[in-house]
Amino acid sequence: MGLPEPGPLRLLALLLLLLLLLLLQLQHLAAAAADPLLGGQGPAKDCEKDQFQCRNERCIPSVWRCDEDDDCLDHSDEDDCPKKTCADSDFTCDNGHCIHERWKCDGEEECPDGSDESEATCTKQVCPAEKLSCGPTSHKCVPASWRCDGEKDCEGGADEAGCATLCAPHEFQCGNRSCLAAVFVCDGDDDCGDGSDERGCADPACGPREFRCGGDGGGACIPERWVCDRQFDCEDRSDEAAELCGRPGPGATSAPAACATASQFACRSGECVHLGWRCDGDRDCKDKSDEADCPLGTCRGDEFQCGDGTCVLAIKHCNQEQDCPDGSDEAGCLQGLNECLHNNGGCSHICTDLKIGFECTCPAGFQLLDQKTCGDIDECKDPDACSQICVNYKGYFKCECYPGYEMDLLTKNCKAAAGKSPSLIFTNRHEVRRIDLVKRNYSRLIPMLKNVVALDVEVATNRIYWCDLSYRKIYSAYMDKASDPKEQEVLIDEQLHSPEGLAVDWVHKHIYWTDSGNKTISVATVDGGRRRTLFSRNLSEPRAIAVDPLRGFMYWSDWGDQAKIEKSGLNGVDRQTLVSDNIEWPNGITLDLLSQRLYWVDSKLHQLSSIDFSGGNRKTLISSTDFLSHPFGIAVFEDKVFWTDLENEAIFSANRLNGLEISILAENLNNPHDIVIFHELKQPRAPDACELSVQPNGGCEYLCLPAPQISSHSPKYTCACPDTMWLGPDMKRCYRAPQSTSTTTLASTMTRTVPATTRAPGTTVHRSTYQNHSTETPSLTAAVPSSVSVPRAPSISPSTLSPATSNHSQHYANEDSKMGSTVTAAVIGIIVPIVVIALLCMSGYLIWRNWKRKNTKSMNFDNPVYRKTTEEEDEDELHIGRTAQIGHVYPAAISSFDRPLWAEPCLGETREPEDPAPALKELFVLPGEPRSQLHQLPKNPLSELPVVKSKRVALSLEDDGLP
């Protein structure tokens, strides 16, 4: 017989396969049509969303559309342009162009015809009441707050003319016209800078509980409790003298034992530096003792060794400049061929001859396109092209300022035009001082401190926060009352070792600090009432810290053996490293929220550098051993960057865009460390997501921490618990940790996933994973209600879990990597293929079963006996089934037998008797009869079959075989 017909499922599978092949072919044809290399002509050229497409398919910036210039070269950009009508806030040029009103008479021609700077236009300008006129010849206006601020903002200096420096009654006027607080007069320090505050001073009289440094030599007065405390407080170190303290030698800080580890070198001046910096050619100790008695070494592979043994960069060898002190780097240098003499070296603009070869360069505003040809560039691609905002126009660009700032018409820098005068606050070890950056007033905020290093401010509440390393405490006070010890509030006084960095989140009312002794980063409310450790792993020497509450991130520096600068969310998630190369000792960091850049100083490399908030676009602004001998703190405001220097004992400032205009603000200081700017524009207002929630504190029982705003779907905040408690299943309440019988060290990272929960309105956390940051698990007593199930990883016993760091409600939990996402991806990668394979197997089985059924044939024939003896009109058929194995062979008939015929399966085959007579195979069983009752098939089965009571009789030797 022929092959069996395919079933519906088989046909369906074939159709699906054909459809898949058809789709693949269509996709290939579409790709070929779009790719000219495959024979297609390709689609029409598409322009960017901020571009206009000309009829000739050229793309131009959209701002060039209808600007009365044929930029498309087919005039299509000027077709169908409506007649311009300038807004009331714009200035209408004589040729019909519209520009901003503030651009009129600003010294730059924005109108194509120059009508915005014409004499006829500018003579009509009248300065508003809040502005100051620069005089009848300039026709310019500047904010009235810029009057007598020490900077000439008008061309002729009219804003500074007739300014007489008048100090307040409680201030001292220095010889250089600056004002100084009276307490700084005759204090032994040259605070004026010209020595006028220390002239004609008598020896100061010390109080009853004070110690005079230098004995009767007229030294400074210090509190008696500072004497013999193993820290030098007097410049002559007389407070730690051996005869006074009853121990040999000076204080412990001058002995090598003062260094924390054996990997540090003790300078003779008392400080400790990395042992690897000993004899490295760079003087790191104040007294340069780390480079004393060093053998003459060899230079690195990228350096050239001068005749006197010093090392300079190899690229400075034969550069026609004397870099070695003895000039040996230029000895024996030969001048090669000057390629620029022939056809300008092929350069379109500037050709520079080098020692080997030449180099093509471009003038300002151009860039190299093919190493030789210069083309115009978009100046606004440079983030430092403008002070704040850069707007690119055809052939030029325009700088603008953010609200609250105005542009200086001379320097083109944005200056604060709102609020009070900005002031600079810094620590001077035993004091916190303040300098008015406009009036140059110099005052003392907090006197008689022991060893203050870190500080920060909260402008809205006029509060100041600081850390004292000697007392190991964090304090706070109102700035106008901070000089009174009774008004100084202790916020944190427990579990502090070396708090060296401090930052205030002025939006969410939190303080963050680093502790190099505990190697932790922690957070607490501004009153110190609720506290939590965010990071306790992978920290070596954390120092400076800064926060960006507008975007929910914090940044910190680590000057350990593997120095780096890192960032994470303010709730401790999404930790990542920004800088790890070419960095040695990053002491201070600061943020410019407007330009979204991070600045830091490196005391080892003597550099001041910056990056954007993502770690890119790195720039080194200043590299100097003179101005950056040992920088520590750094701050930025407007277009200036400020930093303190321990070795120079001074405060410097420079232009934050190019590193130029370096100047000294204060000098003759005593160990100046941290530095901050106090001004309302430094801390812009923003909504507190935790307080905007319907529930107080965002519904969190303990801490409500802002989450990093990575995307529009990021949660606004997450809840956190104390170090010794768990976050409950609702992601808001806190519970005590399970009981632990012994202290267990958690060697590996533990990640825990919590099911989705509904948060406060507007915040839904779909999946929260967080990691155990702690390295030790304290022994705690379980205090969880019996009805509450504390979630934990099922494969880890309670003794291996640390509640101190497993109670965050957040999206990712691995503080070192996004392990939760990795595990989820791995699980999906395993499950999905298994499901696909299972579906394919099931489909194959169904197709096979359908084919099997269809391949089992039935033979139908009429029963004439039944038809003759009944009145049924239905056709009666007898079905004798067979299988493919049996074929068309019928069993033979037998006349007699002792036992029934058995079909014995063996390995899938049917065994027959050893002597199968043909008659034995012609047997069948009628329905309803026992299988032992066999009937012999007659010679004419269609006429001699017995009559049965069913319409159809079906025998299948495969399905209903003999027993």
Curated annotation (Swiss-Prot):
It is a single-pass type I membrane protein. Residues 740-798 are annotated as: Clustered O-linked oligosaccharides. GO terms for biological process: ammon gyrus development; cellular response to cholesterol; cellular response to growth factor stimulus; chemical synaptic transmission; cytokine-mediated signaling pathway; dendrite morphogenesis; endocytosis; layer formation in cerebral cortex. Residues 46-82, 85-123, 126-164, 166-202, 205-246, 258-295, 298-334 form the LDL-receptor class A domain. Expressed mainly in brain and placenta. Also expressed in platelets and megakaryocytic cells. Not expressed in the liver. Keywords: Calcium, Cell membrane, Disulfide bond, EGF-like domain, Endocytosis, Glycoprotein, Host-virus interaction, Membrane, Metal-binding, Phosphoprotein, Receptor, Repeat, Secreted, Signal, Transmembrane, Transmembrane helix, Ubl conjugation. Residues 336-375, 376-415 form the EGF-like domain. Glycans are attached at residues 176, 441, 518, 538, 772, 807. Ca(2+) binds at residues 64, 67, 69, 71, 77-78. The cytoplasmic domain is involved in the binding of DAB1 and in the recruitment of JNK-interacting proteins. Isoforms, which lack part of the cytoplasmic domain, are unable to recruit members of the family of JNK interacting proteins (JIP) to the cytoplasmic tail. Homooligomer. Interacts with VLDLR. Reelin associates with two or more receptor molecules. Interacts with DAB1 and JNK-interacting proteins. Interacts with SNX17. Interacts with PCSK9. Interacts with MDK; this interaction is calcium dependent. Interacts with CLU. (Microbial infection) Interacts with Semliki Forest virus E2-E1 heterodimer; this interaction mediates viral entry to host cell. Natural isoforms of apoE (E2, E3, E4) have similar affinities for LRP8. Belongs to the LDLR family. This is Low-density lipoprotein receptor-related protein 8. It comes from Homo sapiens. The lineage of its organism: Eukaryota, Metazoa, Chordata, Craniata, Vertebrata.
